Amino acid sequence: MLGRLKDQLNMTLAQGQEEAKNRRRQFQEEDQLRRNNKSSNKLSQNEEDAKNMDSVVQKLNELQNNVVAFQKLLQEKTPLSSIQDLEGFREFMENLEHRYEMTVSEVRRLSHEVNDLQTDRENLKHQFEDQIEKLNSEISNQNSLILQKKDELEKSIQRCSELEEKINSLESAQSIEQEVISSLKDDKTVETKNDVPEVSRPSTDTIGVSSALSKKKKKRNRKNQKKKSTKQNIEATTENDALSESISTPDIQKVAQSEDVDAEQDTVADSKEEERRDIANDDLIVNANAKEPMHHFSFTDLDTLLNWPKYVFHHHKIHLADTIPLVFLDLKPKEYTVDLETPKLVEELTKQLHVAESTLKENSEKFKQNSESLKSRVDNLNDYITKLQNEIDECRRNLLWAESSCETIREENQKNIKKLNDAESLKSRLLQSRTQMQTELDSYITSNSQLKDEITSLKQTVSESEAERKRLFSSAQEKQLQMKETVNKLTSLQEQNNEFDRQLKEQEEDLQNKEEELTELRKLLREQTQDSQKLRLLVEQLELERQDLKQAGENHYSNLSSDYETQIKSLESSLTNSQAECVSFQEKINELNSQIDELKLKLNEANKKYQELAISFENSNVKTQSVEPDNGLSLEALKNENQTLLKNLEDSTARYEHLQKSFKNVFNQLRKQQPSNHGRNSSVSRSSSSVEVNSKHPGSDDMLIDKEYTRNILFQFLEQRDRRPEIVNLLSILLDLSEEQKQKLLSVKY
């Protein structure tokens, strides 16, 4: 772009310089002709015309500068190559409006999407909070359930231990009962073997001890029976049902059963202590009775002795050790009376013993069944404990799963929070980019309005300049016609001057001939005195004619010399003015070069900023694609815009190449036209000084143009590495390089 701007600036400057030179030459020639043809009164008008022309030239230069500046702006800010490309400018403005509408719609869409993201974020927050609250409540419930299960396990373990203790106590009681039964059998067999029917009264010591012990035991048994009477009659029938229901019933029945178990534990402990005491007392009583014979024993109290197993084995918790001391303590000593029906009584006793044995067997079988049922219940309790342990394991697993799910939910929540933060940052970035785009759009709109105003003003100025150009062109054509007429007049005057010179030479030759004739005539006068007067008259006339001719030639020569001197002075003044203008143009060119360098720096900075913006825009596009996959349409639109921009770049490069070729052709034409202008300038003036000045001046301009062109090409050569062969070809054309020199330039590394 900068090389193209430089080439176009050089083209415009060269054309402006050439037009200024031609116009100045025309004006100088016209001024000279007017000065030669008109009188001194018209000199002021010529000066005013010259001033007007200078003002017109200044206005044209200002317009040209404005046009060049506007063209620079267009070439920098737009893909347009020149001001004349109105269709391209219209397309550019339409593209700008279309892009503005697209950006506005995109910004609106992004704002709507950001709002949707905010609403989604809030909804997700509420959902996650609800889920977290639910999970916390579930965790608390599960913790409470786990604590309840732990309490139930502990209670069940305690119950199992208590049941094991009860089973052990029952087994010990059963063993004790069997021992007591065996001892009773032994006593009865001894009694049957004894033939002596009399029963002696026990001693007073043993009776006193037994009566005291019986009183104490009665009191204890009454207290225990009052406590246990309500439970013992029910426990035997309902224990199996209670234990089976305790496995399936809820936690309330388990608590009640635990209370029953505690009460049973207390009763078992009390019964154990009482058993120990009763066993000790029974041992004393049995020992006392064993020492003394049973002579005073009444068989009327045997009913109680025979019926006690039924009461004992009615429930498995009432032991024989509790009932046997009562039987022996309730025996009252009676007087011995001999009865003849003792064998019958013995038979009845034996029958009752057999019945008691059968009842004992039945009770033992029932006890075994109860023990087996208790074992089965213990097994069921163990199974229930294993089930509870499995449930606890499942609860723990559920807890672990809930904790892991809570952790995953927390991680997902953190990820969602990060995503939301990223979305917020993206939203802020998009808002910033939106504000930046809005500011850029506002600046573009203002610049567009300014450009439109400038375009309208420039159109007006261009129309005015075109009108002035047409007027100046018409005046220039008229002046060219006048100049042609003046040139024709000059040629005719030159021919007349030549004819006058030739006539002067002829007259001088005639004068010399006439002087010779005079000498001859004087000789003849001497010889012939008669014709002397006539000859004198003729000589005087010839001298007068010669003097007149001399004066006329001198006057004509002086007039021509003065005219030529004035023309030379005017040409010298125009040369000085043109040199000053060339200096000013050179200064302007230097200023333009400095401005071009500054614009290069600005353009590089703008390119860097554009690259950074493009990178940030690509990152934002990637983020928007990751957050919102529905932005395919905007990406396709951007891709289409990029394709259109690439097409515009290709078109601009093609235009640049076309302009470069046209510049070459114009530059070659200028080179060809410069020698003809040089010959024309040399034909107008004959003086050697004017010819030398006119021949040196265009050459210096050509050198300046060549230097600027080569400088620009070298800058391009240093900047653009991709197009190095084209620039080498241009340098070879300009500098007349050989192929070896071309290869050297191409092989040089920068």
Curated annotation (Swiss-Prot):
One GO BP: Golgi to plasma membrane protein transport
Entry annotated with the keyword Ribosomal protein: no
Gene Ontology cellular component list: cytoplasm; cytosol; Golgi apparatus
GRIP domain sequence ranges: 700-748
Lineage: Eukaryota, Fungi, Dikarya, Ascomycota, Taphrinomycotina
Protein name (record): GRIP and coiled-coil domain-containing protein C27D7.02c
Pfam families recorded: GRIP
InterPro entries: GRIP_dom (IPR000237)
Coiled coil: 28-182, 213-243, 344-665
Stretches for region Disordered: 14-53, 188-280, 672-703
Record's compositionally biased regions (Polar residues): 201-213, 233-251
Alphabetical UniProt keywords: Coiled coil, Cytoplasm
Gene3D superfamilies xrefs: 1.10.287.1490
Source taxon at top rank: Eukaryota
Compartments it resides in: Cytoplasm
SMART domains assigned: Grip
